[in-house]
Structures are given as C-alpha cells and as structure tokens.
UniProtKB/Swiss-Prot annotation:
Record key words, sorted: Cell membrane, Disulfide bond, Glycoprotein, GPI-anchor, Lipoprotein, Membrane, Signal
UniProt gene name: LTPG9
Entry keyword Lipoprotein: yes
Topological type in the membrane: Lipid-anchor; GPI-anchor
Gene3D superfamilies recorded: Plant lipid-transfer and hydrophobic proteins (1.10.110.10)
InterPro entries according to UniProt: Bifun_inhib/LTP/seed_sf, Bifunc_inhib/LTP/seed_store, LTSS
Name the record gives this protein: Non-specific lipid transfer protein GPI-anchored 9
PANTHER family, per database record: BIFUNCTIONAL INHIBITOR/LIPID-TRANSFER PROTEIN/SEED STORAGE 2S ALBUMIN SUPERFAMILY PROTEIN-RELATED (PTHR33044)
Tissue: Expressed in ovules.
Lipidation (GPI-anchor amidated serine): 125
Length: 147
C-alpha cells in the first residue's frame, strides 16, 4: 500500500512539473483553472473507478460557470501534450462526471496570450512567484494524497 502512495506522489509531481512548466508561460488563468481540477488528476487517463464528487463537483462548476477556464487548457496544445491528452480524450473526464462541455464555445472565446509580468529591476519578483506556484501545486497534491 505504501508503494502505491509513493507512486501516486511521483506521478503527481511529474504531472505538476509538466503543467507548471507550461503554465510558466505567464498565464495565471490557466494555473488557477488547473488548481481547481487537482482532485481529477488520478482520473485523467483512467475512468475506472469513476471520478468521485471531489473531482466532479469542481468540474461541473467550471463547465457551467467558467467555460473560458477549460477553453484555455483545451485550446493549448502544450498543456494537452504535457498531460499526454488529445482534445477527444480531454472530453472524456467531464462526460464521466455527467457534464457535456460545449467545446464550440472555445472557438468563440479568445484564449488570452501569455501575460508579461511587470518588469522588475532585479528580476527576483518573477522567480519567487514561480517558486510559490510550484510549491502550492506540490503542497495541494501531497495533502490530497496523504490526508
């Protein structure tokens, strides 16, 4: 059982670093969106067992109230590649949660280009933000797995 927890942590860290590297392109909306969907991480590639309410609740909320959030990830080939997903595979998880996102909205919603952070004289501002984001992702996954 302990080896399963260890493997889950390793997989989570690899996925987080992959997604974080993509999100570091400067899109804070994408980072916030992906944080809401952290409970869905174990179900990205396997829907057996079906995703629990802890995954489906945030998924339904995002589909119903924040379509641009999903569109940012759905329209970003780098995010899909980092998660080893195709657009078709990405739609399986919401469907497993009983929601059908209207992906036609994604073609109408302009996904924001990466937002450049304001320049700083010594450059430390951006680095500390990136470190904090990576730490918050990792902390959330570790807490989710062990508690």
């Amino acid at each position: 059982m302990e080896i399963n927890k260890f493997l889950a942590v390793v997989v989570a860290v690899v996925v987080l670093y992959s997604v974080e590297a993509t999100a570091q392109g400067g899109n804070p909306q994408l980072t916030a969106c992906l944080q809401k969907l952290l409970p869905c991480q174990p179900y990205i590639h396997s829907l057996n067992p079906p995703p629990p309410p802890s995954c489906c609740g945030p998924m339904k909320e995002i589909v119903e109230k924040d379509a641009p959030c999903l569109c940012i990830a759905f329209n970003n080939p780098e995010v899909l590649k980092a998660l080893n997903l195709t657009k078709e595979n990405a739609l399986l998880l919401p469907k497993a949660c009983g929601v059908n996102p209207d992906v036609s909205l994604c073609s109408k919603i302009a996904t924001p280009s990466p937002i450049a952070s304001p320049g700083s004289t010594n450059g430390t501002s951006s680095a500390s933000t990136i470190s904090f984001n990576r730490f918050s992702f990792l902390s959330a996954f570790v807490a989710m797995i062990f508690f």
